[in-house]
């Protein structure tokens, strides 16, 4: 089986990117913009892991966050930089692997980390490294937002269920909220979101 690096480089090369171009999910918008009963999360340093062509990173920058977006494929990062320029926002897009964040030079004090459909594509060993590395770059009290398909939710995506999410983040994180997210791929496939807080 091809590695995830090889698969995604191939997908971008041939233009098969069905995960791109969907609206920002309501659960993330509620966190960033606030709701009638809940204020918006205070802005600061944000990290978008597996940022692709940058839609989420640009959205966060438009709402006052200082954003770093990471992806290990060069082609989408080129497009992301162009889109950020057209949107007149500043985002630091970095080519890096989410399983090696602490070696990428991006810093270690992110107050918000966003994963829109990254961890659910990974193997078990990569997920273990992901959890370690996300924890290494998170500030005390940081929020981690994950939107992911469950197993069997989308063809070609391994998926990840709530039990595994909770098990992997049991040390060093507290699960604040979880729920359904219908807009991860334009309401075609059920998905779930998880909001964690890093222990101080």
Locate the predicted segments by residue.
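A conserved beta-strand element that flanks and buttresses the S-adenosyl-L-methionine
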Residues: 114
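Class I (Rossmann-like) S-adenosyl-L-methionine-dependent methyltransferase catalytic domain
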Residues: 1-49, 53-108, 122-200
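Short catalytic micro-motifs in class I SAM-dependent methyltransferases
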Residues: 117-121
């Amino acid at each position: 089986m091809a590695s995830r690096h090889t698969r995604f480089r191939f997908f971008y090369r041939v233009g098969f990117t069905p995960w791109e171009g969907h609206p920002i999910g309501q659960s993330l918008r509620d966190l960033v913009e606030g709701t009638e009963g809940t204020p918006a999360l205070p802005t600061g340093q944000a990290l978008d892991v597996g940022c692709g062509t940058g839609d989420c990173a640009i959205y966060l920058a438009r709402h006052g966050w200082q954003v770093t977006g990471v992806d290990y494929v060069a082609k989408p990062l080129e497009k992301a930089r162009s889109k950020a320029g057209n949107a007149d926002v500043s985002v630091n897009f970095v080519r890096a692997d989410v399983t090696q964040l602490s070696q990428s030079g991006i810093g270690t004090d992110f107050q918000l980390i966003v994963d829109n459909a990254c961890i659910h594509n990974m193997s078990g060993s990569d997920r273990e490294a992901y959890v370690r590395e996300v924890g290494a770059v998170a500030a005390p009290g940081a929020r981690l937002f994950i939107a992911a398909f469950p197993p069997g939710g989308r063809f070609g995506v391994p998926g990840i269920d709530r039990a595994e999410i909770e098990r992997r983040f049991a040390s060093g994180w507290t699960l604040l909220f979880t729920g359904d997210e219908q807009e991860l791929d334009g309401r075609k496939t059920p998905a779930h979101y998880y909001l964690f807080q890093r222990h101080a």
